Amino acid sequence: MRRLALKIDVDTWLGTRDGVPRLLDALERNDARASFLFSLGPDHTGRAIRRALRPGFLGKVSRTSVVEHYGIRTLLYGTLLPGPDIGRREASMMRSVRDRGFEVGVHCWDHVLWQDRVGARDAAWTREQMRLAVERFGEIFGTAPRVHGAAGWQMNEAAWPLERELDFEYASDTRGAHAFRPVDAEGREIGVPQLPTTLPTLDEMIGLHGVTADNADARLLALTAKSSPETHVYTLHAELEGGRLGNVFERLLRGWRAQGWTLVGLDGLFASLDARALPAHRVAVGTVPGRSGTLAVQGDTDAGLRP
C-alpha cells in the first residue's frame, strides 16, 4: 500500500481558529487522515520581521503574499499588538481535532522564537521551550504527545535527545527522502525515528519556475505519480491550505486518491514501518529550493524533490 502522510503545521492563532476547521472539513470530504501539529503558546508572528535580512526571505514574502494569507493583524502580533495565547484561546478547537479522529501533536511553544533562535540556543533554553509545549499539550488533551514537528524544520544538538527524554515516539523535524533513525558521527542514535517531509511545500513552489496557485497541484502530482517511493510526507500550513489555497489542497487530495495513495497521518505512516529496521542517517544542515535560510535535513539524501 502506498501511503502519503499529511502533516499540518498550525503556526498562528488565525490558522488555529479559522484554518483548522476548514482543513478538517476538506479532509473528511476526501476520506483523508492527517496529523495536526499545534503551536501552543503565544502568537508572535510579527517578530518574524527580524528575518528581513536573511537571504531569500524578502523574495519569498513577495512571492507568497504574506499579508494576503496572514492578514495585517497577525503580522503585528508580538510587536504593535500583544500576541494572543493560542493554547488558552483555542483549546476547544484543538480538542475537536482529536475528537474527529485526527492525530494531534506538538509543533512548538512560540513558533517565531523557536524558528529564529533555536539554532543558537543552549540545552537549558531548548529544554524549557519543549517543556512548556509538552505541559500545555497535556493541559489541553489530558495525555502526553506522541509526535513532534519542529517549527521551520529548525533543531539544535540538544533537541534530538530531548525528544526521547520527553517520551515522543517519532518526529518530523527534517526534510529528506524516507524515514530514518537519526545518529551522530559515531553511529549512535540521538533521538526518535524521523519521518521527514519529502515533498516541496506550496509556499516554496508558488512564484518560482512558472508555478502559480492554478498549477501548483499539477506540479506536485507529477512528483507523486511515480511508482516509487511508496511513502511520502507532505507538509501543509493551516494558514495557507486552510485559507486562500484551500482549493489547491482539495485538488491535491482528489489527485492523490486518483493516483492510488492512501492518505494518512504521521501516526498511520509510522504504524506501517518497522522502526528498528529503519536506516540510520546523520542529520545535516542544508537548504531546500524556495525556502530561505538553512534547516535540518536528512544526511546523504536529496532533502526535497524539486517542483
Regions found by a protein language model. Give the residues of each.
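Positively charged, amphipathic and often flexible ligand-engagement surfaces
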Residues: 194-211
